[in-house]
C-alpha cells in the first residue's frame, strides 16, 4: 500500500524571466553568467526491498522519491510535481536478516540491461502491460518523471547514466543526492533528506505494484522485475 502526503505543491528553484534552460538541463543567469543547476528537492519517499528475486547474486531495492503533491482518491499524485524511481542493486543481506535498511553507498549506472552488479542502478526502460483496456507501456527500472498540472499523467525520462550517493546518519536519517542523465540528455540534479521505511516484499509470491501513479490510463502496476 502506498501512502502519499496530502499537501500543497512545494516551491522548486525559481529563475528570472530572462533565464533559459540549456541543453544540459541547467539554467543560465547564475553567478558570472555560468549555468546554475536546478536541483529538485524531494520530500516524500517509498522504499521496497525485493531481495534477490531474480537469482542474479545481488539484492534489489526500488526507491521512489516525490515532490509534494496532492493525491486523488485512488492515491495517485496530482501534478504539477516530479518523481524519480531508482532500481538499485546492493550486496546481499546475510541469511536470517530480518531488517533491510537501504545501505549507504554510491551507485553508478549499470553497463547494460542484463548486468546487475553491486552498487549500480538499473537502466530505465518501457515495460508493456496488459490491461482490460488494452496494452500500454509504463516506465520501469530507473526513471525521472514530470507529473502534469491538474493531472496524474507522467512524462518519463528513462535514466541511463550518472551517479547517486546514499548516506545515513546515526539517527537513521538519509541524505540521497546525485546527478543522473536519461534519454533526453538532460542532467537531473536531485536531493532527498529524511527517513526511509523499508517495505519488505522479498519472498512474496504475489506481484505487487510499485506505485499507483497513473499516466493517463496507467502508471500503476509498475513491474517488480529489475
Please give the residue ranges for each predicted region.
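Sec-dependent bacterial lipoprotein signal peptides
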Residues: 1-13
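Short beta-strand segments that buttress and anchor functional surface loops
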Residues: 65-68, 176-183
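A short, structured loop/turn motif at beta-sheet edges
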Residues: 166-174
Amino acid at each position: 500500500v502506498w501512502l502519499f502526503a496530502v499537501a500543497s505543491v512545494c516551491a522548486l528553484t525559481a529563475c528570472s524571466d530572462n533565464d533559459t534552460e540549456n541543453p544540459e538541463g541547467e539554467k543560465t543567469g547564475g553567478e558570472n553568467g555560468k549555468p546554475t543547476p536546478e536541483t529538485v528537492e524531494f520530500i516524500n519517499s517509498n522504499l521496497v526491498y525485493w531481495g534477490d528475486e531474480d537469482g542474479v547474486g545481488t539484492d534489489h531495492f526500488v526507491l521512489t522519491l516525490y515532490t509534494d503533491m496532492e493525491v486523488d482518491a485512488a492515491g495517485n499524485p496530482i501534478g504539477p510535481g516530479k518523481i524519480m524511481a531508482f532500481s538499485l542493486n546492493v550486496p546481499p543481506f546475510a541469511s536470517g536478516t530480518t531488517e533491510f535498511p537501504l545501505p549507504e553507498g554510491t551507485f553508478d549506472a549499470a553497463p547494460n540491461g542484463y548486468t546487475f552488479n553491486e552498487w549500480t542502478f538499473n537502466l530505465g526502460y518501457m515495460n508493456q502491460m496488459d490491461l482490460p483496456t488494452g496494452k500500454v507501456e509504463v516506465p520501469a527500472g530507473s526513471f525521472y518523471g514530470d507529473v502534469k498540472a491538474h493531472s496524474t499523467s507522467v512524462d518519463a525520462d528513462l535514466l541511463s547514466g550518472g551517479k547517486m550517493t546514499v548516506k545515513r546518519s546515526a539517527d537513521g536519517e538519509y541524505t540521497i543526492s546525485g546527478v543522473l542523465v536519461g534519454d533526453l540528455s538532460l542532467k537531473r540534479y536531485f536531493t532527498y533528506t529524511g527517513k526511509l521505511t523499508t517495505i519488505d516484499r522479498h519472498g512474496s509470491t504475489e506481484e505487487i505494484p510499485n506505485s499507483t501513479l497513473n499516466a493517463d490510463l496507467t502508471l500503476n502496476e509498475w513491474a517488480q522485475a529489475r
